[in-house]
Amino acid sequence: METPAWPRVPRPETAVARTLLLGWVFAQVAGASGTTNTVAAYNLTWKSTNFKTILEWEPKPVNQVYTVQISTKSGDWKSKCFYTTDTECDLTDEIVKDVKQTYLARVFSYPAGNVESTGSAGEPLYENSPEFTPYLETNLGQPTIQSFEQVGTKVNVTVEDERTLVRRNNTFLSLRDVFGKDLIYTLYYWKSSSSGKKTAKTNTNEFLIDVDKGENYCFSVQAVIPSRTVNRKSTDSPVECMGQEKGEFREIFYIIGAVVFVVIILVIILAISLHKCRKAGVGQSWKENSPLNVS
């Protein structure tokens, strides 16, 4: 008859070893969970107009913060927006130093309140941005029609350049200053009474176009860099019309006329009042100086 097998009682040294092993496992799990709670940034996107440049990313932080670094291909990394809870970082001051360079940025993720913590590879989680060349990729800002003047059957239209955040000798440069002849303007113009548009192009800031005498025209302009493959065109400028300008002068004329009319009325009223006062004063004086009748 076989003796029943009883559960084995562990020896003291075996129990200690198992306890130590279990503690080590818990420590690893806790460390791993701390790392897992820090999420790497994603969807890094450059947003740039007239060289005002902001890097955006996701996700909104939960118990974590971000730091951004930027570099040229041959340069050193520079840290910006330290330990921020924002999901964007303004990098304009770096990229305007040389807008023809190609830049790369990266976003580091840190646990909130423990920025010294690193990932499993011995460094914080991070994600790289796409490469960005401002001269080739920044969006062109909306231009403005500065003025237009008609002489006979010719109209001279002048475009006002947008200012950029690129500086030279402590002066902000215009789009024309930065892009030179790479920048052209396209003018769209049409009769106020018609929807048919005509176009004209120039690599300066002025247009001289032929128009029909006696007709009012409307204008809109667009900035274009033909050599680009992306972001070639700006949005159209606000529409300006010749009739609107005449209407403004007419409105000013009416206002001035109304003011003059009111002033004339006030002068007349004042003159009548003064005349009545003088007449009343003369009558009173005559009565006072008249001799009394003695009966």
Curated annotation (Swiss-Prot):
The keyword Nucleotide-binding does not apply. PROSITE patterns: TISSUE_FACTOR. It holds the Pfam family Tissue_fac. Keywords: Blood coagulation, Disulfide bond, Glycoprotein, Hemostasis, Lipoprotein, Membrane, Palmitate, Secreted, Signal, Transmembrane, Transmembrane helix. A motif (WKS motif) lies at residues 46-48, 77-79, 190-192. A lipid is attached at residue 277 (S-palmitoyl cysteine). SUPFAM superfamilies: Fibronectin type III (SSF49265). One of its GO terms (biological process) is cytokine-mediated signaling pathway. Lung, placenta and pancreas. Residues 33-251 are extracellular. InterPro entries: FN3_dom, FN3_sf, Ig-like_fold, Interferon/interleukin_rcp_dom, Tissue_factor, Tissue_Factor_CS, Type-II_Cytokine-TF_Rcpt. Residues 275-295 are cytoplasmic. Glycans are attached at residues 156, 169. GO terms for cellular component: cell surface; collagen-containing extracellular matrix; external side of plasma membrane; extracellular space; membrane; plasma membrane; serine-type peptidase complex. Residues 1-32 form the signal peptide. GO terms for molecular function: cytokine receptor activity; phospholipid binding; protease binding. Disulfide bonds join 81-89, 218-241. Induction: TF expression is highly dependent upon cell type. TF can also be induced by the inflammatory mediators interleukin 1 and TNF-alpha, as well as by endotoxin, to appear on monocytes and vascular endothelial cells as a component of cellular immune response. It comes from the Eukaryota. The chain crosses the membrane at residues 252-274. Interacts with HSPE; the interaction, inhibited by heparin, promotes the generation of activated factor X and activates coagulation in the presence of activated factor VII. PANTHER family: INTERFERON/INTERLEUKIN RECEPTOR, TISSUE FACTOR. Initiates blood coagulation by forming a complex with circulating factor VII or VIIa. The [TF:VIIa] complex activates factors IX or X by specific limited proteolysis. TF plays a role in normal hemostasis by initiating the cell-surface assembly and propagation of the coagulation protease cascade. This is Tissue factor. The lineage of its organism: Eukaryota, Metazoa, Chordata, Craniata, Vertebrata.
